[in-house]
């Protein structure tokens, strides 16, 4: 299928919040070219979901083969132990040289060792789920895929699952059909641990999205973004006007705002859990997981290597608000002045601003929450700018559409599709209207954030 056709389908899906029934027969037929996905337990494009739940009845680990899938003779499987510096270095090199680039090959993700340690070593992680493929002769790592355990709530049902991420095949070997083999092998290994469901995301359309969200970008350093061609100068605007438009206050506004500390975790987690209850798909965190994902790694001494930034608002000993964002910079490939672009990503947050209202969409409660989140996320942008980030990204997920436009987040070209493996569910709204604008009225029911 051509890239143009995929984009057209992506646009249609985002307009319909992932509802496959609104695709034409010809569009569905085109999507059937994804032969691999036709063999997998995923919702088909022309399938009418009548009941939520597993697609295949659960087997037992004893039903799953013990041996890994066969590879071409020149390749071999390996388990990557990210506690081993040399093995981590191999993943670092593979992803930084071969992972997602933009179409013009001007930018690509610059994954750091600190980021991998954070993203791949959550509680319950196992080297067996960090799978690599090496060349037998040279031992060069040429492919990678990872899974970490997560506990998902899909509406009222809680399911043990994994989160699949960092699927990467070396550019020169993408004709070898390694991707389907990697997916099948990670599935086999996860099934052997008695887990039968997975959450994953992709920018492309696969069978069949649970939801579709749109990216939004808030410039923090407009002048640099323009110079590296990350953004354009709008018609009838000057550079000085654009810099002035996106200039932020030098100091945060929220009284009682400070970094999240270990002693805050019980209060912050309780606040977070109550806030998350409004969404249809979320990850449920244990206390140990909450500490891992939101308490900054004290072993990272250098501030410029810090990955996650988490803050709470404390009022008279009570935690009333919480927000977090993480850093994942870009490498700039063709610029003599700048080598990297600092990128902040809005992560999870919670506020008690509307807790006294039973209806999430109560007019007064919505107004209070919008005001509170706008202040908190602007403070997040200020802190990100202070930490040398040049742009702040968010999705149309969670309650983000309440503040994106007011805080000068512009809609991006990219969309992110959410998928569930071996689990049927009705479409979940992704915060988009039919014309792909941010849906401030209905917002999103997606409460899970993937890296």
Curated annotation (Swiss-Prot):
InterPro entries: Acyl_CoA_acyltransferase, NMT, NMT_C, NMT_CS, NMT_N
Class in the EC hierarchy, top level: transferase
Annotated Gene Ontology cellular component terms: cytosol
Entry EC number(s): 2.3.1.97
Subcellular localization: Cytoplasm
Catalytic reaction equation(s): N-terminal glycyl-[protein] + tetradecanoyl-CoA = N-tetradecanoylglycyl-[protein] + CoA + H(+)
Coiled-coil ranges from the UniProt annotation: none
Gene3D superfamilies recorded: 3.40.630.30
GO terms, molecular function: glycylpeptide N-tetradecanoyltransferase activity
Active site: 451
Keyword set, alphabetical order: Acyltransferase, Cytoplasm, Transferase
Residues holding tetradecanoyl-CoA: 34-37, 167-169, 175-179
Record-stated family: Belongs to the NMT family.
Protein name per its UniProtKB record: Glycylpeptide N-tetradecanoyltransferase
Name of the coding gene: NMT1
